[in-house]
Regions:
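Ligand-binding pockets and gating/stacking loops
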Residues: 1-283
Length: 283
């Protein structure tokens, strides 16, 4: 019954925003609100003031916790999986964002993850898997370099350098997939399963690119404009903004139905120089 209800009406879209350091409830609960009630006449606190125009459609759920997943800053995969998690520990099961993406009406990309970090970390590790998973031992990578993500989503409808880089990357990935698939057949049975996940990753990327090519005309209406934030970011927040633009465009265009945004990418990160926050940690 739940599945039937969720598949009717307009398109459903879900966004998970993960902040691994936690936050004070006072940053989202209006002053004087002690029990459940309408937000129509409430004044939202400064940190969520941007949601003021939408507060009559807004629900704030207070009191949820994940202390069973980790006693520290981040539970990594456990935060969305509901199980114990910690740094360097692979997922022991699927996460709720992935499971919900399967229940919603099918899209070209079932689930998109983007991660925001310091500019240095995003450049040296443009993809990382710490928060989402499709199953035990099956992490889902999040994208942190907006240039790479733009090529993945909109490279097929681009021109100039972006198009050339997209075509070159596509050719390389196709060749790697073919080579990897052929080499894996000679591995022992136990290793073949693990190696198969590696090959499947290339198949998923190449398959997504082919599916996106079939709706190129539609995607042109939603592709963000590439500007200096992509190629010459002054602060990490320039890339954060570009990643958010890409994530929202993927939702509105119908590329995906579920977006997971990892602030800090599941790790300990707190410097936002573009917002005037220079220090990191317990300051």
């Amino acid at each position: 019954a739940a599945g039937k209800a969720i598949s009717t009406g307009g398109p459903r879209r879900i966004i998970f925003f993960m902040q691994n350091q936690g936050f004070d409830p006072k940053t989202c609960i209006p002053d004087g609100m002690k029990s459940s009630g309408s937000l129509a006449k409430a004044k939202l606190p400064e940190p969520v003031k941007a949601l003021e125009p939408y507060k009559e459609r807004l629900h704030i759920i207070n009191g949820l916790h994940g202390t069973h997943t980790s006693p520290s800053h981040s539970a990594f995969f456990g935060a969305l999986g509901g199980y114990r998690g910690s740094d360097g520990v692979p997922p022991s099961g699927p996460t709720i964002d992935y499971e919900l993406s399967k229940v919603l009406p099918q899209t070209l990309l079932p689930h998109l993850c983007i991660g925001m970090d310091s500019i240095e970390n995003m450049k040296t590790k443009p993809t990382i898997a710490t928060l989402s998973a499709s199953g035990a031992g099956q992490p889902i990578f999040m994208h942190s370099n907006p240039n790479h993500l733009y090529q993945l989503l909109y490279g097929g409808i681009s021109t100039g350098d972006i198009r050339r880089q997209h075509e070159a990357r596509s050719n390389v990935l196709n060749q790697i997939e073919q080579l990897a698939a052929s080499k894996g057949r000679s591995l022992p049975t136990g290793d073949q399963q693990r190696y198969g996940q590696y090959v499947q990753g290339f198949q998923d990327v190449n398959g997504l690119r082919d599916r996106l090519d079939t709706v190129a005309d539609h995607l042109r209406k939603f592709a963000p404009t590439v500007d200096d934030r992509y190629t010459n970011p002054e602060f990490e927040t320039d890339w954060h903004d570009a990643l958010l633009d890409l994530g929202i465009s993927a939702l509105t265009s119908g590329i995906t139905n579920t977006l997971t945004i990892g602030s800090g990418r599941g790790q300990i990160f707190g410097a936002w120089k573009g917002l005037g926050v220079e220090q990191q940690g317990h300051n």
